[in-house]
Amino acid sequence: LVLIAVERHQLIINPRGWRPSNRHAYVGIAVIWVLAVASSLPFLIYQVLTDEPFQNVTLDAFKDKYVCFDKFPSDSHRLSYTTLLLVLQYFGPLCFIFICYFKIYIRLKRRNNMMD
């Protein structure tokens, strides 16, 4: 969505300037994938597979079942990581998209006023 907002912003704000190409799209997609994998690495590193929650259960349906848990070194590490994810994966793109579309809105409003 961020890349779509950037493309729309560029085409409306600077129509004769930079135009995104297929190569730009592929580079943008590759960067997004690298960032997604990098931001998920702590989950991969701190995952623990255990049958601990099912050890005291007597139901046959839960025997031999396993669960993945996040086992960060401390609660402050987990809190810092999840807060960073929230900021980088939600608020960052949301603000960026908002700014792009706000600039588009201002430009289109000015064009409309010029035509009136």
Curated annotation (Swiss-Prot):
Compartment(s) where it occurs, according to its Swiss-Prot or TrEMBL record: Cell membrane
Main location: membrane
Record's keyword annotation contains Repressor: no
SUPFAM superfamilies, sorted: Family A G protein-coupled receptor-like (SSF81321)
Bilayer-spanning residue ranges: 1-6, 25-45, 82-102
Extracellular side: 46-81
Keywords, sorted A to Z: Cell membrane, G-protein coupled receptor, Glycoprotein, Lipoprotein, Membrane, Palmitate, Receptor, Transducer, Transmembrane, Transmembrane helix
A cellular component annotation (GO) from this entry: neuron projection
InterPro entries reported in the protein's UniProt record: GPCR_Rhodpsn, GPCR_Rhodpsn_7TM
Bilayer topology term: Multi-pass membrane protein
One of the record's GO molecular function terms: neuropeptide binding
Pfam short name (any one): 7tm_1
Cytoplasmic-side positions: 7-24, 103-116
Keyword Lipoprotein: yes
Sites carrying sugar chains: 56
Function of the molecule: Receptor for neuropeptide Y and peptide YY.
Similarity comment text for this entry: Belongs to the G-protein coupled receptor 1 family.
Protein name: Neuropeptide Y receptor type 1
Species: Ovis aries
